[in-house]
């Protein structure tokens, strides 16, 4: 623990906590101050000036990052018949029906994305208490409740991310790995920022993005100037 604290202090010394960096500077600093011994994940965090208690100010969606996330996603699909075969052909890791519900209720959670055809939502609904808190419940808004299961699987495997504002208006998203070229992280960051800007509620007032930062798995947070995006 002492070693980690020393590494964190060294990382913090390289950052001006009073400054909001340009996206390019922030990405470079995130890579420079990362001290994890593994290929750490790079994540961005937004605080938005929205009131999520209002139905028209709830932000939720999905997008495919231009350079992927660097993470291998394990995709589970609830489907039957031809759609089940379609999901398997597209590369789904797990495909099934009731037997998967029982397995998940038994504590199995070795997957990252859940996709379902609309007709399967009646049985998937039984998993609400398990999948809901983990943000894994299939939803039409994120493209995970669909008849086009092949597309959903391929997008999930190809760098699709989902995002949702919490009760305080915070949104987090993975934009890649520390090992990515800086230009690719910047491109992913800008693409995600575009999605956040497009999702701005028409009824939102004042400054939309009140705080923005970038961090790695074990690294310090670095403030980012939203205007640089």
From Swiss-Prot:
Give the InterPro entries listed for this entry.
Ribosom_uL1_bac-type, Ribosomal_uL1, Ribosomal_uL1-like, Ribosomal_uL1/biogenesis, Ribosomal_uL1_3-a/b-sand, Ribosomal_uL1_CS
| Keyword RNA-binding in record | yes
**Function text:** Binds directly to 23S rRNA. The L1 stalk is quite mobile in the ribosome, and is involved in E site tRNA release. Protein L1 is also a translational repressor protein, it controls the translation of the L11 operon by binding to its mRNA.
Q: How does it assemble?
A: Part of the 50S ribosomal subunit.
Superkingdom in the source lineage: Bacteria
Gene Ontology biological-process annotations: regulation of translation; translation
Keywords, alphabetical: Repressor, Ribonucleoprotein, Ribosomal protein, RNA-binding, rRNA-binding, Translation regulation, tRNA-binding
Pfam families hit by this protein: Ribosomal_L1 (PF00687)
| UniProt record similarity statement | Belongs to the universal ribosomal protein uL1 family.
Q: Which GO terms describe its molecular function?
A: rRNA binding; structural constituent of ribosome; tRNA binding
Q: Which NCBIfam families match?
A: rplA_bact
Name the record gives this protein: Large ribosomal subunit protein uL1
Q: Name one GO cellular component term.
A: large ribosomal subunit
